[in-house]
Amino acid sequence: LEYKLDYSKNINEIKKLLEKVSEDIVSSNSNNGYTSQKQKILRIFRTTGGENYNQESIELRLIVIDSLYSTNMEKRYFPFEDLSTEIYSLGRTEKEVIKKIQNFRNNPDTVLEILNMIDDKEYGIYKNGKSAGGAKSLLTKYCYFQLMLDTDDKIGFPIYDSLAKNMYQPVCNYVGLTGKRKLSSSSDINIIAYLNMMKELATKLDICGQYSLQNFDILDAYLWRMGKFSEGNFSLLLNKEEYLTLIKAFKLNEYEKDKNNTIEVNTLLKEEMLKGYKNVLDNEIFSDLWKHWLHLLGKMENENNEQ
């Protein structure tokens, strides 16, 4: 007899967490860096839309996204001019651009303009004049925010991001989504394959318009948060006071080896979080994310030990 594992408990665990994350994001009381950053970008999109929509407004949007999401376009020469020219060529009105992005998401093989824009074209140059390469992460973030302006769109657009890519495999393992799903933070796959992988995961988690956020918005919020835990980087998950409380609780404020070494501090934070401390913060959603991350990590470790 073939024995099949029942992953329904794990799936339900994530679904309950998604509901809490969704409520937290839309709550007027939410004051973490993630929500604040997202709202700032959306305000820029709204004030630069409609009659104000032009190539200059697109460039402004790209600069703000790049700055807040640290996609590092500013290290290139002339990337935003190239990117804004490409996006503006999709249509002279936002409605045209939104429609093309939606068509690409639904039938990616049929909208070559966006496929080539995200996957093939290069933007900006290096100091020596050589091409600086593509901008997949920034462009998917732009598409993500662009579709959020359409209140009738319940699906949204997935962000191609190292945190999401890094957590895709362990989450698939946790919910029993098997098959060839090799994806990591360093993977560079085409946008169509990435779209299909995220669609499949969203279906497995039964994300189908049942949350107050778009489908890909809530999926990205979940993967991003788990990725932040895995990096030991909580600055955008907490407000300043909560973050300082966490540092003090783990006595990292006494760490003097190298105060400017952010990576080292992140590693120490992660190590302390792995010990499973509870009730360090009076923040229910953070506590729930923390516990789930420990469950997720335990699943990963168990599978690795069995191999």
Label each PLM-derived region with a short phrase.
Residues I101-R105, T151, R181, S185-S186:
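Surface-exposed cleft-lining segments at the edges of enzyme active sites
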Residues L1-R43, T48-E51, S57, G156-Q307:
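C-terminal accessory module of base-excision DNA glycosylases/AP lyases that mediates lesion recognition
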Residues D66-N72, I87, I118, Y142-L147, ...:
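Generic structural signal for hydrophobic core residues of well-folded globular domains
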Residues L62:
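Phosphate/adenylate-binding glycine loop and adjacent helical scaffold
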Residues F45-T47, L68, L83, M148, ...:
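Enrichment for repetitive, rod-forming helical segments
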Residues D119-P170:
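Catalytic DNA-binding helix-loop module of base-excision-repair DNA glycosylases/AP lyases
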Residues N54, S67-G134:
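Helix-hairpin-helix/helix-loop-helix acidic hairpins
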Residues E74-F78, L149-P158, G176-L177:
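Short, solvent-exposed secondary-structure capping/transition elements
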